[in-house]
Structure formats: structure tokens, C-alpha cells
């Protein structure tokens, strides 16, 4: 390639770039315009740059000037296109025949909705909200709650330890002891919070999930009070016509221990069935003593429930993983 051919190719490329940009509608997005321009010029610019080095030394000065002028000309054409767009943007064009766009509505997560509703019910029953740390000591998480030293829940395969004596709490029950240490009875608290287990993520288990803990401690508190309060909660949450039942269960920090079942419809066409929604019982005297209170004077009851599982029973969900998938198609159903 000689100098005259080089200059002719540079002029031709400049003309084609100007023609391309001049022919684009101002409604064309700038990134689209740049994409079309790059497709036209990039390979040819690279070829001209390579050819520059092959020209005789006496021609390179003129060819180099032409190459720089070419790049400036292309940039000027692109700037002119942008200015045309800016000038046109001041004119608002509305197509009244276009369908309206839907409005995205934010919503609370179904588990949060359940926690808020349960919390409001217990507030109306005289409970206040209490919180505790998610990183706990082994004593608050196990020892103060009457877990024997060789209890399997304390093993590494069940609990996530942060250090020799610190761990991610496996339940919200430590809030019981911390609350009783801080406040004198009568105490009625509801403790929502995140808990952690070394569980596999499957249809019914999650390694991190929310839990709700309830505690009532005073003089003369009995199992009758526990049953009456939880039955009233179920009536308000599930409806006055739903039946509840209590059965025996075991937890180290209560004695006696029980579980409460409620008749619910899981939405699978099989009608009402009994579903366990919480564990409960009378606070073990050792727990009351660990909090620094006299177990001969004070008694109490406690319960714990998983709002995710309650949300599943409320909304007919059979796989807990759906609650954690962040699928907008699922979550937008709960927008109010």
C-alpha cells in the first residue's frame, strides 16, 4: 500500500462512519449506536494502524497525521449524534395506545409476616419483645438450660462452634436466662431471632432459620396458664374453629414438656390434619435457679416455635427451601 492508497482508505472510512451515524434515528440508544460504529471501524482502523508501519519513512508523517485526523473525525461524528439525541430528548413523545406498565409492589417476606402477626397477638396478651445475642456462650446455650454435659446437641456435628466456649446459638432459649437475670418477675416476653444448626438444607430443614421463644415467669404460674394462653394464640392465628391438642414431649429445659398440634389444611386436597406447631412446657427448676431466682417461689412456662414451618402450614407450602429461594414470582404473592 502506498501513501495515496492509505489516504484514500482513511477518507473512505471517515465518510462511511459519518454516513452511518447520520442515518441513525435519534431514538437509537447510544450504546447501540456505538456498537454499530465499532463493528464498522474497528478492524479497518487496526489495519490502517498496521499499514502505517509498512510505509516508507518519508510517507509516515503524512499518513500518521491522516490517521489521527480520521480518529478525531469519527469521534466528532459520534459527539454530533449525541447532541442530536440531547436536542430531541426535550420533545416528549407519548403513544397513548401503549398498554400501561405494571407497578412493582414490595412486600414483607412470608416468614416476616408470620413473625409480625404472632408478635402482635402476644403483645395483646401482655408479652413484650426480648432479644439476645446470636453468638452465645456454651453456658447460656446449654449449661444454664439444664443440658447434661454429654448431651448430643453439644457435639460438633450438631452445633456451629466459633471458639472453645462460643457458638452460634442453636435456639432462642438462652434469652430465657438472660431475661430472668435482668428483670425481676413477673416476666412475660416473646423472643424472635435467628438460630443456627449444622443441618443439611432439605425440604424440612435449614441450617439457619428464625425461631420464636415465649417465656412467662411469676409466682403461682401453672400448666393451665400455658395451655390457656397457647390455645388462645392458636384461636386468634388459625381461627376460632380450629382444634388444638397437647401431647407429651421432652426438652431438657422444661418439665413436664409438651407439644401443641393444630388442625390445619396444607392445601394438598386432603383436608384438615394435625400438625405440630410448637414445643412447650413448664420451665425446669434448674433453669430458674441458673438465672438466680428461687425455684420454690417462682414457676414459669415457655414455648418455642419455628415461624417458617408455621408459614408453611399457613400458606400450604410443602418445601421450606421455597421460602429462601428469593423467587420474585413466589414472593410477590404476599404483597398487600
UniProtKB/Swiss-Prot annotation:
Please provide the record's keywords in A-Z order.
Aminoacyl-tRNA synthetase, ATP-binding, Cytoplasm, Ligase, Magnesium, Metal-binding, Nucleotide-binding, Protein biosynthesis
Location of the protein in the cell: Cytoplasm
Q: Which InterPro entries match?
A: aa-tRNA-synth_II, aa-tRNA-synth_II/BPL/LPL, Phe-tRNA-synth_IIc_asu, Phe-tRNA_ligase_II_N, Phe_tRNA_ligase_alpha1_bac, Phenylalanyl-tRNA_Synthase
The enzyme's E.C. designation: 6.1.1.20
- Superkingdom, taxonomy of origin: Bacteria
Q: What class of enzyme is it?
A: ligase
What is catalysed by this protein?
tRNA(Phe) + L-phenylalanine + ATP = L-phenylalanyl-tRNA(Phe) + AMP + diphosphate + H(+)
Q: Which residues are recorded as binding Mg(2+)?
A: 255
| Gene Ontology terms: cellular component | cytoplasm
Q: Name one GO biological process term.
A: phenylalanyl-tRNA aminoacylation
How many cofactor units bind, and how?
Answer: Binds 2 magnesium ions per tetramer.
Q: Which CDD domains does this entry report, sorted A to Z?
A: PheRS_alpha_core
- What's the main place this protein lives? cytoplasm
Give the protein's cofactors.
Mg(2+)
From the UniProt record, which GO molecular function terms apply?
A: ATP binding; magnesium ion binding; phenylalanine-tRNA ligase activity; tRNA binding
Q: Which family would the database say this protein is a member of?
A: Belongs to the class-II aminoacyl-tRNA synthetase family. Phe-tRNA synthetase alpha subunit type 1 subfamily.
- NCBIfam families from the entry? pheS (TIGR00468)
Assembly mode: Tetramer of two alpha and two beta subunits.
Q: What is this protein called?
A: Phenylalanine--tRNA ligase alpha subunit
* Native source species: Gemmatimonas aurantiaca (strain DSM 14586 / JCM 11422 / NBRC 100505 / T-27)
